[in-house]
Amino acid sequence: MKILSKSGIEFQRLELPKVTNHHPCNPSVIISGNRMMASYRGCNYSLRRHAGFFYGSRATAVPDSQNYIAQISDEFTCKSVDFIEDRHVRAREDCLDGLEDLRLFEWRSEIYAVGAGANWRSRIEKTSPVQQSTMIFGKLCGRIFNPITPFLTNQHTEKNWMPWVIADRLYFIYAPQPLIILEYLPDEKRVKVVETKSRKALPHASGSSCMVPFDGNFVGVLHVKLPMENKVEYRHRLFLASGKFEILAVSEEFSFEGEIVEFCAGIAVRNGDFYLSYGVFDEKAIVLKISAERTMKFLFE
């Protein structure tokens, strides 16, 4: 496995600030015009110890999420951080325990986000199961997340859909292997499956980043969870795809910093650089600026 921070490629690393007692994690970076920003999550637990909840009721200790929006300067510093207002979202049955791992993307000249709305009540109360994690699609207006629609499926847990904007149409990678693409129908506020044909297949993995334009095609990041002794190790793959959903190339597995738990939720491209955003152990939120050309050479050759 390759480690990007030990590749010898020059990079800049921006750690987004801790806002409350919640640990920061899993940022999603976006570049819109001349602005760069990143959403990221605060969580009330520690992965470094079993049942390590440090905020909330001891009787009903469940994961709880806060979300923030950071403005990033041209000098690659954090200019400001605000809460993403979600109290109205938490009034929803499917989001009682917050929104997890928002992915920011631009569509039709506006900023949108999709994330996993969490409801742990059925597990706590041992009642008939409700959907525990539901993908919620909405628009980010300043620092307010306004839900548009939930995407209801027959799965108990939905997460990590990958937004993919092609021209003015919005798609999501629902599953990498086999490749399942969903198209959003705005008039009906629902998604439909799109037929795809690709000679090259993606590996067995899960979604991570959005898809963004790169060198005439699109680039994105997948994550893989590998069971180890009493733990799970996360690894990533970069991949290229065409606007017709043809998989063009898949990189070797890599880690950002060599940590066991890393999770990439964002990628952006500007002036020949990749901006890769990821969490470390659900306790740090990082944006990495690194040469796109040298990164591609390191991961694909």
What would you call each of these model-derived segments?
Residues 1-301:
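Beta-propeller domains
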